[in-house]
């Protein structure tokens, strides 16, 4: 009689990120299956909040993202890829406050003050993270508007202003 041995491996976060193609392809590792399932249930606000955990600007990226997740989507082998980027946009568009909302509760203030130079996506993201960690943050920007290349490099027909 042949003895067969099996090895059980519990899938952790790193396994999921490596083996779910859309998750592995996303530069910020957004929980794509998680927010799509919430949209399917009609829970747009939960989908938006889940998306915002990995990405401070889901309403913007739902419009301009290069969506490498769609190129990696396994569904394309059956018919066509899931419209992941459009679903991200839908979650933001259906959010009652229009896509603005707290990602995590603010922590009690710390006395240390920090400055962030540049109000582009990276500067605003780090300022958001630091403020939510309780630091007092001031953002400096040379341009007359915040947003960096989002505001001055992307045409208004692609990303609406105001």
Task: Label each residue range with its predicted role.
Residues 115-117:
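Conserved beta-strand elements of the Class I
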Residues 1-113:
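Ferredoxin-type iron-sulfur electron-transfer modules and their immediate structural context
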Residues 29-41, 48-51, 55, 77, ...:
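Beta1-alpha1 glycine-rich phosphate/pyrophosphate-binding loop at the start
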């Amino acid at each position: 009689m042949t003895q067969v041995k099996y090895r059980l491996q519990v899938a952790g976060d790193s396994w999921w990120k490596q083996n779910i193609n859309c998750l592995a392809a996303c530069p910020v590792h957004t929980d794509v299956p998680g927010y799509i399932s919430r949209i399917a249930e009609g829970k747009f606000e939960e989908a938006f909040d889940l998306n915002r955990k990995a990405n401070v600007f889901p309403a913007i990226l739902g419009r301009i993202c290069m969506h490498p997740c769609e190129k990696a989507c396994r569904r394309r082998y059956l018919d066509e890829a899931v419209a992941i980027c459009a679903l991200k946009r839908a979650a933001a568009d259906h959010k009652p406050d229009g896509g603005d909302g707290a990602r995590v509760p603010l922590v009690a203030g710390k006395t240390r003050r920090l400055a962030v130079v540049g109000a582009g996506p990276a500067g605003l993201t780090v300022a958001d993270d630091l403020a939510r960690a309780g630091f007092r943050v001031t953002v400096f920007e040379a341009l007359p508007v915040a947003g960096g290349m989002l505001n001055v490099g992307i045409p208004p027909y692609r990303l609406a202003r105001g």
